[in-house]
């Protein structure tokens, strides 16, 4: 079953195992509502997180590893170096075309997280894998107010925290 979380509100959809976290608002709103800091400390060459930090949810980047984001209103995320125990890893991003906001279009595009991108990252198809997928997706507010068009595909091991990347895990 693919679930869908918004970055500020929980929304569930039905399909295999993906949770969509969608954005609502921009960094200024996050500051008002108590979101995390602007960004984590990162390696200048690789862009990888070098020190754990609670960051604004809009600062989450491809390759970031995070502690479980939970559900409900999400304004921030706890990013950690991938070498440390973590629950989630952003493994792919899907750029949506401009136009009117559509939950159906976002849900359909999110299916790309469990297709070829998943197989390329993990090494086996989603159907054969023991791993799950969540997505961080635009909400209506973030679409309209922050020009948010990116769906972030996030891989999760339902068995618990992992250390290191799940790239090539083949399970």
Predicted features along the sequence, with ranges:
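Bacterial N-terminal signal peptides that target proteins for export
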Residues: 2-14
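Hydrophobic helical h-region of N-terminal Sec-dependent signal peptides
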Residues: 15-19
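C-terminal motif of bacterial Sec signal peptides marking the signal peptidase cleavage site
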Residues: 21-25
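Primary mode marks residue(s) on the alpha4-beta5-alpha5 output face of response regulator receiver
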Residues: 27-171
